[in-house]
């Protein structure tokens, strides 16, 4: 039996430790991780919801003036960028090695970012969805699917690499307007905190990148969009219906002249597909309205050869170009980088694709 005074002393010491832990809960102390210094913090939102978890990685000898913010796509977290599912170095290490400070975020209501029950609704992806769209596309659900060769392993349930990838899938906020709006605000708050940066988005997060640039044009040095949510306006396989009334976003983005209330003044026209392996595009009628704030921000849209985005990725680049954005379209297949799917930054040649992005950033 612990003596009474010893028990009291133990409780007091524990209380002090708990208070110290509570006071440092929202931001960790920096710690040496060998080649870089790391920390984490929360930013944006309110006390109960819509803050984002952020990890900061700083090289021991930074050589680049602007950091890179990485925002993962649907069902993913910042861990996407750390290593590949089969254990190879990820893009975070690559850009750290090239002197960039790196910020990895978890979207609002995602992963380590808080979610207040009752706001929107949460969903998760089953194994068949992950196989069909990302890892094992040996089918004909889109014309380029059979070209997919770069996923490590079989891409099927039971394969160690697939199982590691699927274990990293998390629930996501399925109310897309809530997700886009909250992530735009939280990542804008991150820019307010850290200053000018490049914003790198993947998939679902693509529309956030456009809106973050629209909200903070003086702080976004460039936008790298890896197969961003698209194409403009209307969904394509595996989704259907009207999704982005503002062209490249769900929520309001600034045009000049104005797009009107709820984008009702955006007139569109259908442009025929460039060939049988691609879809038609919805662009603006001439003369187009210009994306007022995005015009000042250079953008890179990256499309993979075998992805389900492959039939329509060029439409997003064409829409941005028509609206006055300084955009470059990196069609990986046409550049000789073959066999990639939607999760290109995790695949066997992930660092070859990282070189494409690095080259573009260094030109800005």
Curated annotation (Swiss-Prot):
Applications (biotechnology): Phomoidrides A and B (also known as CP-225,917 and CP-263,114) are potent inhibitors of Ras farnesyltransferase and squalene synthase. CP-225,917 and CP-263,114 inhibit Ras farnesyl transferase from rat brain with IC(50) values of 6 uM and 20 uoM, respectively. CP-225,917 inhibits squalene synthase with an IC(50) value of 43 uM and CP-263,114 with an IC(50) of 160 uM.
Cell compartments where the protein resides: Secreted
UniProt key word Signal: yes
Coiled-coil intervals, chain numbering: none
GO molecular function, a single term: carboxylic ester hydrolase activity
Classification via CDD domains: Esterase_713_like-2
Glycosites: 49, 262
Residues annotated as catalytic: 203 (nucleophile)
Domain of life: Eukaryota
Catalytic reaction equation(s): a carboxylic ester + H2O = an alcohol + a carboxylate + H(+)
Biological process annotations from GO: lipid catabolic process
Signal sequence range: 1-18
One Gene Ontology CC term in the entry: extracellular region
Keywords in alphabetical order: Glycoprotein, Hydrolase, Lipid degradation, Lipid metabolism, Secreted, Serine esterase, Signal
EC numbers: 3.1.1.1
Function per UniProt: Part of the gene cluster that mediates the biosynthesis of the antihypercholesterolemic agents phomoidrides which are dimeric anhydrides. The function of phiG within the pathway has still to be determined. The pathway begins with the highly reducing polyketide synthase phiA that catalyzes the formation of a C12-fatty acyl-ACP, starting from one acetate and 5 malonate units. The hydrolase phiM is involved in the release of the C12-fatty acyl chain from phiA.
PANTHER family named among the record's database cross-references: AB HYDROLASE-1 DOMAIN-CONTAINING PROTEIN (PTHR43194:SF4), HYDROLASE ALPHA/BETA FOLD FAMILY (PTHR43194)
Family under the similarity heading: Belongs to the AB hydrolase superfamily.
Protein's UniProt name: Probable secreted lipase phiG
Organism phylogeny: Eukaryota, Fungi
